[in-house]
Every structure is written in structure tokens, then in C-alpha cells.
Amino acid sequence: MALHRMLALLSLWLGLTAAFQPSRIYRRTVSSEPLPPSQDPWYSAPDNDWENTEPGTVLRVRPAPGNLTQVVGNSSAAYNILYRTTDSQYKPTWAVTTLFIPKLGSNSTAARVFNQSALLSYQVPYDSADVDASPSYSSYTAEGASGTVLFDTALSLGLFLNVPDYEGPLASFTAGVISGHATLDSIRAVLSLGLGLNTTAARVALWGYSGGALASEWASELAVQYAPDLQKTVVGAAIGGITPNVSAVLESVSGEDSAGLGPSGIIGITSQYPEVRKYLISQLKTDGPTNKTGFLAAEKLTVAEAGAAYQGVDLFDFFKQGSDILRDPKILVAINRDGIMGYHGVPQWPIFAYQSVKDEISPIANTDKLIERYCAVGANILYERNSVGSHPQEFLLSAAPAIQWLATALTGKYAQVYKTEGCTIKNVTRNSTAIPLRKRDGPNEVFNLWSKI
């Protein structure tokens, strides 16, 4: 299978019961069937003074249109929530998240095991500069619906599931700051509404792989300055296939099967910096097979479509200055602010980091350096370096251990089960024949559910 196909699969596999103040929620009439965000008027800020509200303030909420609870199994209800967040230049903007409600009731797993208090924020690696690839819409499409088995798994465990469109309204793929802000504010928005979640005792965990890990890691490092109110509520984050340095990823994928990540990533990060975007466009060639039109076409492509369109293409052939574009000071304005992890804060909650040492998209040396940086200042990290597997394969190989780690944290048993303080770095060999889950000291019902994954 071509790598871009595997990346596409990677990006895909993955009752309103609480009272709230109607005056805080602004609704707009929408079709009962889902529309792409670019065509749906619901995906817009309200015509009021929303910019002066606090980050995480809910601006609109609606039951998810169409048949989303049929597409996603084990969900009793689903809601779209539009909320105020902050872009990469620390200006007010908005984003959308989708909240899936598990099966509730006194005999449900959500009630028995978690007291309806466990919220998993899963950041989908949608890896696209097209706003219509956002999970709140793509989950309905043939491409996206085939990947909701991971949603089903989380919901079957009794977890409330938060799935943010963390790239924001400009589809700012690879822009770390807005991705982190939008992730944190989606959690704030959900906690402010409840929607069946026991918010007085809520535990929240984050999970993401590849592009989803980008959002989850940035949320974790930004929280200390941007969302200190969440530090006692968030119990941990599982991040795999981490991309600490956007430039390194662009250089790795150029000319390879996954080259489509390049145009989408550059278009995405520069969407947060209009002057940088303007300069970038001026540096694109205007003729030949790799020209401006071809490059900018990525703005309307999903990760799978971009993977097919740019497979094997040398990314730097589009630019007048070739690979030096990544070292151009005018481009570095965006990359240095928004594309390099580890310089905005230190995660204050436990981290489970995992990556293949053979990762062909994000060199593991950069992840090693990031972890070492955090370890030097007291972060609590379990880091597993898998000796086998490619970037997409590692997503599949380590999904079950990640779920185990997350569910243990959400039951409040992280310290008891994992017994790690500070940094623990392990070299592991996790392949398709390895036992994916090992029973530890946790709720039997959760382990029984894990065994069915």
C-alpha cells in the first residue's frame, strides 16, 4: 500500500442533560443534513461582541446534523459546539468541536466505571489545509466515516469524546499555537456545558498521533501559560509520531510518497501570517510542471487527495530558491513561532510519548531532543521508542497501549499502575505479533473492553 494511502487511513482510523444559559448560546438555522464548513453558515462567528469573551466561551451549539450517531457507534448523542479561541498571533478567533456522548444510564460503563466523569479529547490527524476536511464534517464522508472505529472504541469504554477542529477556520495545518489553543479551548467549552458529563469530578485526557499529536503536544506545552485552570482537570496526554520540527518534516517528506504533507503544511502554517503567505506566494515559480497553481491546489485537498496529487514530488522544485525557502528569514517568522515544539512551556501533566525509531516522516532524533529538554526541567514522561515500524505502522502498533495508558489515567490509577515519576525512557519492540494489552491494576470492566479492541 502506498504511504499516502496508509496516511489517509491513519488520519481516518481514528441527551442534552445539563442546563445552560440560553443567552450565552447563539444559534443559526441550518440544514438537517451536514454541509461542508465552507458552505454552512453555522460555521461563523456570531454578530455580537464575541471577541471580548473569554477563551473557551461557547458561541453556538447544535445537535450534530444528519445521522452522525449512526455513523459513529456506541454514541447516544453528538453535538457541534462553536467556541471562542485564540489564533497563533494571540488574536480572538473561533473553532468548532464535536462532542460524542456515550451510552448513559445507571448500568452503563460510563456510569459504573467512570461516574460519567471521563472525557477524552481525541485530536484527529486530518493533516489538510482544506477547512472542509475538518473532522466535524469529514466524519460524514465516505473517506472519514470509515475511520471512526477509534471513536467507537473510546465510546464503548464509557468515555465522553471531544473531537476538535483544532486547525481553526483557516485550516492552519502545522500551526502549533492555534492548534494547541483550539484544543484547550474545546475542553473548556465542553466542561462549561456538561451535556451529561459529570463536570464536578471531571478527568480529561488528550490523545493524538502525527498531526493529532501536534495539536496535543502544543496544548500540553501551552497550558501552563494559556490554560492554567485545566492543569488539575487534565490527567495526561498520549502523543505518538510526534513532529517537533516542521522544517525537518518538510525536508523528510519531499520527493517521497508522503510529499503531499508538504504543500498542505506550508499553506496551513502561513495562513496564520498573511504577510508571510504573501511573500511565500511571490517565491513560487509561475511556469513549468511545479508552479504556483499546482502548489496552491493543496488548499482544497484532503490528506488522501494531496498524497495522491504530490506523491514523489520534490517539494522544493516549486520555489525559485529551492530548499533555501525554509531558511529564508521571512518564512522563518512563521516556522520559528509556530512550527518548533518545546519553547512555550513545560507540560504539567503526565505524558505518554511513543514513536518508531525508523519514523520516515518525523526523524526520531528531534523527538529525543524534545523529550530530553522536558526531562531536564522536571516533566513527567513515559517515552517508548519502538524498534520496528514506519510512521503509519506505529500508529496501529501502539494504539492499544495508548488506550490502556489513557484509560488508566482517567480512572485515577496512573501513579498506582505505571509508578513513574519524572522521565522513563524505554526501547521497546512492539510488532503485530506482540501482545497489545497486558492486564494491570485497573477496573476489570475496562480490561474486558480492552481485550475486544
Kindly label every feature range from the protein language model.
Residues L14-N107, I453:
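Catalytic-loop region of hydrolases
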Residues E33-P34, S44-N48, G240-H344:
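Accessory cap/linker subdomain of secreted extracellular hydrolases
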Residues D87-A154, D165-E167:
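Short, surface-exposed "cap/lid" segments of acyl-processing enzymes
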Residues N115-L119, S156-N162, A201-R203, Q231-G236, ...:
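Loop/turn elements at helix/coil->beta-strand transitions in domains of secreted/extracellular proteins
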Residues S146-L150, F173-G196, S220-E221:
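Alpha/beta-hydrolase active-site loop
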Residues R188-L261:
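Primarily recognizes the serine-hydrolase "nucleophile elbow" in alpha/beta-hydrolase
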Residues L332-I335, I361, D368-I453:
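C-terminal catalytic histidine-bearing segment of alpha/beta-hydrolase fold enzymes
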Residues P347, F352-D359:
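Short beta-strand/loop motif that positions the catalytic acidic residue
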